[in-house]
């Protein structure tokens, strides 16, 4: 039967039926007749809706496929086939917009012409018997019932068949065809006899013979027969005594359950050591942009042209010198690399026509900075078999680092609003169904809250840099290509703006595997003096390269302009994820959406509008040493987005491990707050697993610090 269903029905219908059975905990391998019945019912619901539209005059019309008028409003809203939460959201929305009475059970369709819900039935028995069962179950005059049988009979409330003769004939023909196909394969009798009434019937299912012997052999230890195991499972209390459960398990399991009380958990131990350093691929709050408004120059949109145009807006260049050396690097090479960039950009400007890309001369300073010829020679393993002391080279353990205040400042800054608009979501067509209308409304509200956010700027900057670097890595594998770090935005007044943050020079990039590394040197403009927090800039050599005139309330003032230079590296897989940083917007929108859904299910109506427009309501944002921080819904949106963006910018194995292990402790603490009396074993092992992830990563250390604040306030 399962094979027949997969051959006979559209794959989309099969997939929806699989999901429905999974949702109700039914096994389609066993309940094959039910699988076929669900697919049949879904197909009838879809056929009922197909080709039926409402025109501008409010009349119901039938329109075949490929008709230019196919953008008319659908007559029927399909509720069947959606997961329960979404289905009820649609039903609630329809009731709110049309004034229809809310049904007790989920109906299958809503008819916008007749303004009524419809329950579709497909039966293998007498239509009038099935109709009465449906009517007794629903007990509502507002839901229209329409029953079809496999023999071509039908029955509907007050003999009102809703659809025209031809549409109903299509459904009956399809049902008859399904019956014939089943009969040809010898499946029909079993299918016909398997139909139950609307009330579920419990029966004792006996297992005999070989299956019984197999069942007895397959029991867990300490169970002598299937009846004992059944009785144990039936009496299993999920929140019962854990020790009792463990005693029934294998003798190998030896765990003493300790009660988890308010006094049980201790704070996570953060490592001691020198302060942690900045390790993102580009500057965040410290970045400085050279910008042009309303770009209309020749070659606008070509990165090199845009970069040169932005560079021309600054007139305060001066002879560069080192203000904060890199402790381990040859700092003169970083200085020479910047001078080379300036000189080669000047050469481009002197040319008659500016090229689209610029490959840097392979000077000694760039070769050093990009690690050219530094990789150890690869030797085939077969040629080394005879070497007696062959071993992997020793690698040093990473040095432990302590949490530093700069990472919290970075996060706070990422949550702030800028004076530019960083995302513009394209129009995606007119909303037809209620669920689309709700989705668009939520998306628009969310976009309004985050489009000016600095975290959104980081997304667009990350997408641009990773895309440009991956393109160059594939297109110019052997070249030291100069890649401008650019972003685009709009001012509050709606004027377009192109920004230059600095430059990247890419090293050799023969990237065969996803994890093969391409080295690059980044050179980024900033007004931040590195001497204020030298530990943050451990990996950088910082030059002073000019003086910038800034307008302030007290007039013009001059500030030194710095260039942050460092050697860095990335891989194909990291660039691929960097290019997809816009996913962070989706992730944080989904988190907000789940908050709206929770609110809506309590109020039994869609609360999107109230959620975003009630400015007086304060929402919890996070934990700090002061307690639970609260803010507007806009602040919640921006904080969730910033967390998602930082998870992307500071992605690492340390973060993966900390997130997975700390979640376990979080769940236990939440169970305690919910008075569920949790018990634990090997809590020390869990702390060990969490703390081994706290090494030197600034974002992980900050998350651990937040977790400690949560523990303090949650267990008061």
Swiss-Prot record:
Keywords: Cap snatching, Endonuclease, Eukaryotic host gene expression shutoff by virus, Eukaryotic host transcription shutoff by virus, Host cytoplasm, Host gene expression shutoff by virus, Host nucleus, Host-virus interaction, Hydrolase, Inhibition of host RNA polymerase II by virus, Manganese, Metal-binding, Nuclease, Phosphoprotein. GO terms for molecular function: endonuclease activity; metal ion binding; RNA binding. InterPro entries: INFV_PA, PA/PA-X, PA/PA-X_sf. Its cofactor is Mn(2+). It is an enzyme of class 3 (hydrolase). Pfam families: Flu_PA. GO terms for cellular component: host cell cytoplasm; host cell nucleus. Its main location: host cell. A motif (Nuclear localization signal 2 (NLS2)) lies at residues 184-247. A motif (Nuclear localization signal 1 (NLS1)) lies at residues 124-139. Mn(2+) 2 binds at residues 80, 108. Mn(2+) 1 binds at residues 41, 108, 119-120. Its EC number is 3.1.-.-. Phosphorylated on serines and threonines by host kinases, including human casein kinase II. Binds 2 manganese ions per subunit. Plays an essential role in viral RNA transcription and replication by forming the heterotrimeric polymerase complex together with PB1 and PB2 subunits. The complex transcribes viral mRNAs by using a unique mechanism called cap-snatching. It consists in the hijacking and cleavage of host capped pre-mRNAs. These short capped RNAs are then used as primers for viral mRNAs. The PB2 subunit is responsible for the binding of the 5' cap of cellular pre-mRNAs which are subsequently cleaved after 10-13 nucleotides by the PA subunit that carries the endonuclease activity. Influenza RNA polymerase is composed of three subunits: PB1, PB2 and PA. Interacts (via C-terminus) with PB1 (via N-terminus). Belongs to the influenza viruses PA family. This is Polymerase acidic protein. The gene is PA.
